[in-house]
Amino acid sequence: MFRTILRMTQTELFDYLVDILKEKDYNVIVGKNNILNEREYIAAKGNIPIVLLAHLDTVFPDETRKNMSIYHDSEQGVIWSPNGLGADDRAGVYMILQILESTDLRPHILFTTNEESTGIGAEAVSSKKEELFGKVSYVIELDRQGYKECVFYDCDNTQFQKLIESYGFKTEQGTFTDISIICPSWGVAGVNLSVGYLWEHSYVEHFYSAMWYDTYRKVLQMLNDKDAYSKTWKYIPKELKIDLMKKYNKDIKKEFLGK
């Protein structure tokens, strides 16, 4: 399945995912920009109030997808392509599909378009939490490079951070992904988790199945943790700490004014 997903254009993958979700008896909502005539997201409400999120586009041109060469070292569990693999973020899409195929769990599902360029899919759902899902405990985006990493961006909910770290992740810093738009708008905490790719956005991008599987197991644990998802984890924006500002101002005065 993973190779099939890697070879699809964003449009082909969009259609494929709509069909899969319908087969799983989800009520599927397709978000569309009628002015631009572009489809922006796929949303499917489940009975577990955790949103699993991945984006459908890659940085590589769609026309290179169909005939791309894919190499697999089965002993090392590594996949790569000289055409640009696109595991960012097809690895996240694949994880969501495997959860649906291999378990009876029914989390909320959200797939967005054009994260790598405009973030238009995330923008389109930023005001639609109640309409699409109702209650949301928190959001898991599956779009981070590497292994065992979790990123919270500008969400400063320390209790939520401790919860995610308790599953075996280590907090790192990041710049942008869809939850950077969605979570502040929804007022709900979110995290981006590693899904096993390295050297993304380059022609030497590699995908490591063991790294991916480690996160897969942890996400299953999170989806089964009813005590955790029974509450809503609030989005708390980061603020510049007042005590740090005071220290900064004091240091400036001392250096320039001798005070």
Task: Tell me what each language-model feature is.
Residues 150-186, 256-259:
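An extended, acidic, His-containing surface patch that forms the Zn2+-binding/catalytic region
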Residues 199-259:
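His/Asp/Glu-rich mid-to-C-terminal helical/loop segments that flank catalytic regions of hydrolases
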Residues 3-48:
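A non-catalytic alpha/beta surface segment that caps or lines the substrate-entry region
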Residues 83-164, 171:
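Acidic/histidine-rich catalytic neighborhood of metal-dependent amide-processing enzymes
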Residues 170-215:
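Zn-dependent metallopeptidase/amidohydrolase metal-coordination segment
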Residues 23-33, 70-73, 167-171:
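Short secondary-structure junctions
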Residues 30, 44-106:
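Active-site metal-coordination/substrate-binding segment of hydrolases
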